[in-house]
Amino acid sequence: MNYQVLLYYKYTTIDDPEQFAQDHLAFCKAHHLKGRILVSTEGINGTLSGTKEETEQYMAHMHADERFKDMVFKIDEAEGHAFKKMHVRPRKEIVALDLEDDVDPRHTTGQYLSPVEFRKALEDDDTVIIDARNDYEFDLGHFRGAIRPNITRFRDLPDWIKENKALFADKKVVTYCTGGIRCEKFSGWLLKEGFEDVAQLHGGIATYGKDPETKGEYWDGKMYVFDDRISVNINQVEKTIIGKDWFDGKPCERYINCANPECNKQILVSEENETKYLGACSYECAKHERNRYVQANNISDNEWQQRLTNFDDLHQHA
């Protein structure tokens, strides 16, 4: 494989995010990179892809900047680009937690756990493991025994914690996310909320899966990623599928977006059921006049109406 996908972040001061984003986009395009990068006054959060040569040049360029000299890059080999375009966008935050009283992870954050230390935490009955990701990420794969917050956006996590605080009373709390950036701020928020014993998986799931000692042990399913790959393997010890098809509940690890552009819900679905149910999550979405699956596959009105009856069969067997 001649391509690489880079996942990285750094909490650091960027005085002029708008100008930085403009200059950074020009640099990335000049080096034929593709991806999505967020920048703010609090730092940078990015995922991008390119050839090994191009990504090595990018990492060298970033490490030459005093602000990013010790930034850690998580690297995956790939067969091609993981993105279709290159975006660098200035934002208020590099992860959207939207706190009234913001947390600076450079000053307040949970204890860092190495992959080996995190594995011990997974084995400890007195430790609560919280998945800091969204529900659709959890449903594709997660650490065994982890708590699933019922959220679709990271910014909803603090409210969920407040509503379920009794679950964590007098327990050690350990949190994890994809690459570590969400936990840097979330674990700091937990400390400010009065939780005394708070830790986080340093480097996230991505680092844990590559650790030569843990080898991704106790991870079930696949890890959701925010690029064209959709998911990647983590557990090198054993293979399990925990995702379930949206329609029939059978084991499934294939995510699609609902074909209704006004819905766009992410669902796990087999190719067979995607065809059967017109790429939609519901009857209402399947019959939507701008159904993308219908348009992309040039399905006639008669065939469209015929396949809509599949939802009748679905309800009869529910």
Curated annotation (Swiss-Prot):
It catalyses: uridine(34) in tRNA + AH2 + O2 = 5-hydroxyuridine(34) in tRNA + A + H2O. The active site is at C177. Keywords: Oxidoreductase, tRNA processing. It comes from the Bacteria. Residues 123-217 form the Rhodanese domain. Its EC number is 1.14.-.-. GO terms for biological process: tRNA modification. GO terms for molecular function: oxidoreductase activity, acting on paired donors, with incorporation or reduction of molecular oxygen. Catalyzes oxygen-dependent 5-hydroxyuridine (ho5U) modification at position 34 in tRNAs. Belongs to the TrhO family. HAMAP family: TrhO. PANTHER family: RHODANESE-LIKE DOMAIN-CONTAINING PROTEIN 7-RELATED, THIOSULFATE SULFURTRANSFERASE/RHODANESE-LIKE DOMAIN-CONTAINING PROTEIN 2. This is tRNA uridine(34) hydroxylase. It comes from Staphylococcus aureus (strain MSSA476).
